[in-house]
């Protein structure tokens, strides 16, 4: 019941099975919850090995998860006291549409009334949160997966249009890219023996995309578009100059 999974029994063999397995397969939230629950149970069963099973530290903000979920379910606005890393503390009202996990951080995406637009809010930068009595209507045309469909990471700019991005990946890193794609739109369009492979994407050119490509360093080469290739080249030269 916790995961919305129906378990039934085959009376002929007395075997239990998940009757809604196809539904579970297509529901990423339930998959994530069930996997987390399974891992938690395995670790609890092997408590004597807890010092040998290491996890990344999750930032603060998880204490607000239940409040955000309640607000989403009841369609109530949130009053938030917020302080971003590079800005001033402010109080605003948010209509929560969806939530997303990225790089071990929780984000809530919704309509920020004071700025009259959809924004992403990091839960670990929230100082205080209050569930208000003010209701809102979730737009019929808002689809969380579609909202993030052409972006790497959390940053979305409505003014940007997706472009064809081609990245050449070298050596053994090709296998890493195949097993852990940069984005779900990834397609391998060319392979040159074991030397390199070209991967194509449909992406908006966001700062997070640039950062991830830079992080791959000499393992990759941006082929298209020319503007992104030039941006990566300039940033790499700037990094080299730091060491002169």
Stretches found by the model and what they are:
Residues 1:
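DNA-recognition element of transcription regulators
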């Amino acid at each position: 019941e916790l995961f919305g999974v129906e378990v039934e029994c085959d009376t002929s063999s007395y075997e239990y099975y998940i009757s809604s397995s196809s539904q579970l397969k297509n529901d990423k939230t339930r998959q994530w919850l069930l996997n987390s629950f399974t891992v938690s149970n395995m670790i609890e069963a092997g408590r004597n090995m807890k010092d040998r099973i290491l996890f990344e530290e999750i930032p603060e903000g998880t204490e607000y998860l239940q409040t955000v979920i309640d607000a989403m379910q009841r369609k109530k606005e949130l009053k938030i006291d917020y302080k971003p890393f590079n800005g001033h503390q402010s109080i605003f009202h948010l209509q929560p549409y969806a939530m997303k996990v990225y790089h071990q951080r929780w984000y809530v995406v919704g309509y920020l009334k004071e700025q009259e637009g959809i924004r992403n809010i990091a839960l670990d930068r929230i100082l205080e949160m209050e569930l208000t009595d003010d209701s809102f209507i979730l737009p019929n045309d808002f689809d969380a997966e579609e909202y993030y469909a052409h972006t790497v990471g959390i940053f979305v700019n409505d003014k940007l249009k997706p472009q064809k991005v081609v990245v050449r990946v070298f050596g053994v890193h090709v296998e890493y890219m195949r097993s852990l794609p940069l984005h779900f739109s990834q397609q391998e369009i060319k392979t040159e023996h074991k030397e390199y492979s070209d991967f194509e994407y449909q992406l908006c050119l966001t700062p997070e995309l640039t950062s991830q490509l830079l992080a791959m360093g000499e393992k990759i080469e941006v082929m298209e578009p020319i503007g992104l290739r030039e941006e990566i080249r300039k940033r790499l030269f700037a990094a080299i100059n730091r060491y002169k």
